[in-house]
From Swiss-Prot:
UniProt-annotated catalytic positions: 79 (proton acceptor)
PANTHER family: URACIL-DNA GLYCOSYLASE
Molecular function per GO: uracil DNA N-glycosylase activity
PROSITE patterns: U_DNA_GLYCOSYLASE
Name of the protein described by the UniProt record: Uracil-DNA glycosylase
EC number: 3.2.2.27
Organism for this UniProt entry: Xylella fastidiosa (strain 9a5c)
Coiled-coil ranges per UniProt: none
Catalytic activities: Hydrolyzes single-stranded DNA or mismatched double-stranded DNA and polynucleotides, releasing free uracil
Length: 253
């Protein structure tokens, strides 16, 4: 079985490669028939010689980096970057050494304007994830050079369930919804229990329509401080200070 298919193989619950706290809360969803179909689809694409990103061991990296009870904030993306070597399981993030995508450049621009934090020399957002920011794409796999290739194949139901579970079982979280796609996915969120921050997508095509200047990073910390969860440290270390395992392309927590 190829790596992508193995990551969601549902022949036995014990084989699901999902961080233990998340497995307890949402793992049963991966046993559903539609997820079995998704696993078969991923295997078939691999057999056909198609490059699927991220590698199977990193499909669930967002959950590995941010266990269920450690989540403070959620940033929702759409699907992984579709260039070779970019995606590593965290939305908007790229592996160290990869060029910064335009949307991430705008995220860094807003971060500097909002909090005075200078742009780092890399695009790896794993430090945010390890500090409680769930960097969740709606679709967890993509094909080389084909943005959106795996939309409608089954991932959306699983990630909808993740968002709904956080909404119901946690309280006082911050959901940062950038763009209409993320905002539609976040409609289930109870704004009496959580803070929902909405803005345009950070893409260069839309960032000037409300993302730049949204101050979501400081608003997030203000809310978290008021609700006793502790603020997020949004700073990112220089590339040279990142964990060696990260530099080698492996999510380490």
């Amino acid at each position: 079985m190829n790596e992508q298919g193995e990551a969601i193989n549902n022949s036995a619950e014990s084989r699901i490669q999902l961080e233990s706290s998340w497995k307890a809360h949402v793992g049963n969803w991966l046993l559903r028939p539609e997820m079995r179909d998704l696993s078969a689809f991923l295997r078939a694409r691999k057999v056909a010689g198609v490059s699927v990103y991220p590698p199977g061991s990193q499909i669930f990296a967002a959950f590995e980096a941010t266990p269920f009870q450690r989540v403070k904030a959620v940033i929702l993306g759409q699907d992984p970057y579709h260039g070779q070597g970019q995606a590593h399981g965290l939305c908007f993030s790229v592996r160290p050494g990869m060029p910064l995508p335009p949307s991430l450049l705008n995220i860094y621009k807003e971060l500097e304007e909002d909090l005075g934090l200078l742009r780092p020399d890399h695009g790896c957002l794993l430090p945010w994830a390890k500090r409680g920011v769930l960097l969740l794409n709606a679709v967890l796999t993509v094909e080389d050079g084909r943005a959106g290739a795996h939309q409608g194949k089954g991932w959306e139901g699983f990630t909808d369930h993740v968002v709904d579970t956080l909404n119901r079982e946690r309280e006082g979280l911050v959901f940062m919804l950038w763009g209409s796609y993320a905002q539609a996915k976040g409609k289930v969120i109870d704004t009496r229990r959580h803070l929902v921050l909405k803005a345009a997508h950070p893409s260069p095509l839309s960032a000037h329509r409300g993302f730049l200047g949204c101050r979501h990073f400081s608003l997030c910390n203000q809310y978290l401080s008021q609700h006793g969860l502790g603020m997020v440290d949004w700073s990112l270390p220089p590339c040279i200070a990142l964990d060696g395992a990260i530099l080698n392309g492996r999510i380490a927590v």
